[in-house]
Amino acid sequence: MMSAAPSPDPSLDNEWKEWKTTFAKAYSLDEERHRRLMWEENKKKIEAHNADYERGKTSFYMGLNQFSDLTPEEFRTNCCGSSMCRGEMAPDLPEYEDLGKNSYLTPGRAQPE
């Protein structure tokens, strides 16, 4: 007996359409179902995380974004090519620099009381 492949949740149709419009997403007929199911899975993970946030178990809130239709592998492959994603944010910066020494900073203006 074969199990049926998952089907998109019809109660999310309007939210899915709004998300696609917001992020200018368009898919071929073949890809639409796959992207919708991935989006729904990511939405559930986000909602579970945010429930933990509301209970004080995590320190940040999550939301749907332009990457919400990607698998984790697709995100890593397509969106994490930058040095920031690899943990190399600024390897050549000095540990400390006095910005006032080279006049990078100017004195503050007088503020009314």
From Swiss-Prot:
The keyword Repeat applies. InterPro entries: Papain-like_cys_pep_sf, Prot_inhib_I29. Keywords: Repeat. Residues 15-20 are annotated as: 2 X 3 AA tandem repeats of E-W-K. One of its GO terms (molecular function) is cysteine-type endopeptidase inhibitor activity. Pfam families: Inhibitor_I29. SMART domains: Inhibitor_I29 (SM00848). Sequence repeats lie at residues 15-17, 18-20. The keyword RNA-binding does not apply. Not known, expressed in activated T-cell. To the propeptide regions of cysteine proteases. This is Protein CTLA-2-beta. It comes from Mus musculus (Mouse).
